[in-house]
Amino acid sequence: MIISHKYKFIFLKTTKTAGTSVEISLSRFCGDDDIITPIDFADEAIRQLFGKKPQNYLDFDPQGNTYKKYFNHITAQEVRNIIKPSIWNNYYKFCFERNPFDRAISFYYFDYPQNRSIKFDEWLKNNYYTNSFINNNWNIY
C-alpha cells in the first residue's frame, strides 16, 4: 500500500493481482513523506535496488506507543479511518482486480507451488477455490 503525498494518490493493494510488482514500480517515485508499507523479504530486496524501502507506515504517540499502522493489504475503510478527510477526498485512489479465471489459476499455483497432487479442475470442483477467496479483495476497495 502506498500513500503518495508527492503525487497525491493512494494505491490499495489487492491479492493475486500483481500488486507487489506495481508497488515496487511505484515506490521508486515516492517522496520522503510518502507512506510505503513493507513487503516480503525477497521482494523488498528487489524494491531496494530502486532505492526505496518501507517508510512512514508506523506513527507513534509521545510515549512511543504505535497508534497508526499501515500494512500491505489494508482496506480502503481502514485507510480512510487513519488519514485526514482532506487527503482521502482529494487524492486519486486506485487498485487492480484480475479476471476471475486468471486469478483462480494464479491461486492454484500459489496454493500448490510444487506438489500438484490435486488437478486444477478437481481443485475447482471440490471447493478449494471458495467464495471467500473469490470475494476476498472486495473489502479492500
PLM feature spans:
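Membrane-interface amphipathic segments in extracytoplasmic regions
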Residues: 1-141
